[in-house]
Amino acid sequence: GGGGSGETSGMWFGPRL
């Protein structure tokens, strides 16, 4: 969902940003 290690649903950034 937000600046993490890429979620399945609702990817805001994807990798860690």
Swiss-Prot record:
The modification Leucine amide is found at residue 17. One of its GO terms (cellular component) is extracellular region. Transmembrane segments: none annotated. Keywords: Amidation, Neuropeptide, Secreted. One of its GO terms (biological process) is neuropeptide signaling pathway. The keyword Secreted applies. GO terms for molecular function: neuropeptide hormone activity. It is found in: Secreted. Its main location: secreted. Mainly in abdominal perisympathetic organs and to a lesser extent in retrocerebral complex. Mediates visceral muscle contractile activity (myotropic activity). Belongs to the pyrokinin family. This is Pyrokinin-5.
